[in-house]
Amino acid sequence: MNDTPQTLEKDVRDNLLLLYDFDKDYDVKLLKYSENVIFKITFKEAFPVVLRIHRPGYHNIEELEGEILWMDEIHRDTDVELPVVYRGRDGRFLQKMTTFSGEEVYVSVISFLEGSPLGELKDDELIKGLESLGEITAKLHMQSINRDKIGRAHV
């Protein structure tokens, strides 16, 4: 990606309301700038969301859509707490945005889930978190087995 975090933040500010039906009063904060660029969008009158700018050329549109559709299925079919994926104004999960440098990128928006980085947890919290991770992994394993049985494609 040829854009800086600052120009991408401006791109998000300029395009968010064109792509999604969100409240006009919001704040944008960069959370992570790496292979994907992640912004937290905080609204005055609604719950925060996360906007992800997907790294261009890393995954094609079918792979990105597959990942999002699987998240949506997991959310619907299990009790695993996952972010809700938001659809854009056009009804699609993935939206195309042109950056300041002219590069076309895909963006997606999910609900924000509170959490703490693993490195900040105390030992007892870490053990509890890892036990929970094991339970979630088992549920995801069962969901993927059931997904295969009903003929849903692999992501």
Where are these regions (language model features)?
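Juxta-kinase regulatory segment immediately upstream of eukaryotic protein kinase catalytic domains
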Residues: 1-28
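N-proximal short alpha-helices
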Residues: 4-7, 11, 37, 58, ...
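Alpha-helix N-cap/helix-start motif at coil-to-helix transitions, marked by capping-box chemistry
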Residues: 6-7, 32, 104, 131
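Short N-terminal amphipathic alpha-helix/helix-capping patch enriched in small hydrophobics
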Residues: 12-13, 34-37, 67
